[in-house]
């Protein structure tokens, strides 16, 4: 059995949240010098559940069937709480995205994580 495939979607999202945060920070720092407070404000534009949820529909067409399955499992996961800053559907979509990133990271597929991150940033910056 595949250990990673058997993890709960919420466990995958827990890891994926950290992976995504790191990717966003590296992306922003890579743009050039900025003050930490500016970087933090800019990072919020990417990491908020509403921002993550906006890119998921467009991202889906680039996913493999296995990745779409992980995304679906993440979307259907039911955490014990929902944040007040996002609608339930947005939060579930952001959990789905984080589940996918966590899954790929734990599978050791960093190249795919970076490929999807590049696409996510491109989609996010179109808004």
UniProtKB/Swiss-Prot annotation:
Its EC number is 3.1.26.-. One of its GO terms (molecular function) is rRNA binding. It is an enzyme of class 3 (hydrolase). Its cofactor is Mg(2+). Homodimer. GO terms for cellular component: cytoplasm. InterPro entries: Mini3_fam, RNase_III_dom, RNase_III_sf. Involved in correct processing of both the 5' and 3' ends of 23S rRNA precursor. Processes 30S rRNA precursor transcript even in absence of ribonuclease 3 (Rnc); Rnc processes 30S rRNA into smaller rRNA precursors. HAMAP family: RNase_Mini_III (MF_01468). Its main location: cytoplasm. It comes from Moorella thermoacetica (strain ATCC 39073 / JCM 9320). The active site is at residue 17. GO terms for biological process: rRNA processing. It holds the Pfam family Ribonuclease_3. The keyword Nucleotide-binding does not apply. It is found in: Cytoplasm. Keywords: Cytoplasm, Endonuclease, Hydrolase, Magnesium, Nuclease, Ribosome biogenesis, RNA-binding, rRNA processing, rRNA-binding. This is Mini-ribonuclease 3. Belongs to the MrnC RNase family.
């Amino acid at each position: 059995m595949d250990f990673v495939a058997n993890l709960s979607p919420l466990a995958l999202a827990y890891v994926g949240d950290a992976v995504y945060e790191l990717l966003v920070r590296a992306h922003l720092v890579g743009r050039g010098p900025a003050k930490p407070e500016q970087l933090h404000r800019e990072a919020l534009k990417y990491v908020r559940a509403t921002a993550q949820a906006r890119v998921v529909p467009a991202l889906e067409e680039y996913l493999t069937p296995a990745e779409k399955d992980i995304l679906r499992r993440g979307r259907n996961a039911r955490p014990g709480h929902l944040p007040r800053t996002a609608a339930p559907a947005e939060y579930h979509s952001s959990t789905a995205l984080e589940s996918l990133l966590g899954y790929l990271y734990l599978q050791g597929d960093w190249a795919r994580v970076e490929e999807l991150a590049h696409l996510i940033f491109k989609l996010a910056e179109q808004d």
